[in-house]
Amino acid sequence: MTVQEIKGKKLVKGIAPNVEPEALLNDKRKVFLFGSPSYTNIGDQAIAYAEEKFIKNHFPYYEYIEIMDYATDEGIELVKEIIREDDIVCFTGGGNLGNLYLDIEEDRRKVFSAFKDYKSISLPQSVYFEDTEEGQKEKKKTQDAYHQNTNLTIAARETQTLDVVKETFNSNVIFTPDMVLSLDIVPRELERDGVLFILRADKEKVTDEDFISQMKQWAEKTTYTERTDTVLDTVDTIDYADREKHFMEMLDRIGSSKLVITDRLHAMIFSIITKTPCLVFGNSYGKAKHSYRDWLESLNFIEYTDKNDVEELERMIDRLLQAEPNDVDLSKDFQPLIDFFAS
């Protein structure tokens, strides 16, 4: 089999955008990452960015090959032709294992059942199946697909998900933080001004708009405010080549703010990277809350709250703004993932 034959038959756009085609056929042990996002959620783009850095930093002797989400079917067919016994199949991490984002879940089922004879991992995820007839029906489909693969490991990124995975699946399970927390990025020194509200506009949103208006009015007494989201509406897609640019732009936007108020897990994590004081509210099933409680509670410039009394929140924000930002070292918490890839 030659690269030309692969290209001629099945090397479509979205398969291996991060390497030269020849890399598909070299003698290195390969790590195939499926589900690499092309949609405009910068949190998920940052996860994919961090996954690549993690594998390349810890295992430079592996060939890391991404398959974009829009090329899943073609990617499965091509990888079947070139995969070897000791290669590893991954599906990208995030907060989409469950029935809320079925297109992604259906791809994950396909991948894990297609490669049931190979070492496989769902990278750090939050898991949520709604307690509805539809949610439970989809959970059964996911169980049926995953249980075909006795070589599957599921990485849970909070204790809430760890419990769900243990109850729901027969798979091996490991516990690590979100992949973006593995990044070692020195933030740019930027002039800071204003309060940046980074808020959901999707099916996970639970923060009340009247409450948001109250918070904005409070902030506007002393500074200007801006509202945005970590899902970009200025572009339709983000391919591999543009991922880093959009991620760094989001970090700069957060790093030039005096304060971030958010209900987004990754806006909180981006605030940690840029040392930006951040007040965090919840989503519909506790992703940010449980990640904060499990890994980040020792940080003095980040605070999670369920409160909605503006006066009380003012005092909380004052504390955050006065803090000299500290650090948290989570490197040891990624050891289970290093051990997985090392074996």
Curated annotation (Swiss-Prot):
GO molecular function, a single term: transferase activity
UniProt keyword annotation of Repeat present: no
Induction of synthesis: By heat shock, salt stress, oxidative stress, glucose limitation and oxygen limitation.
UniProt keywords, alphabetically: Stress response, Transferase
EC numbers on record: 2.-.-.-
Provenance organism: Bacillus subtilis (strain 168)
The protein's name in its UniProt record: General stress protein 30
Domain of life: Bacteria
Protein family: Belongs to the polysaccharide pyruvyl transferase family.
Pfam families, alphabetized: PS_pyruv_trans (PF04230)
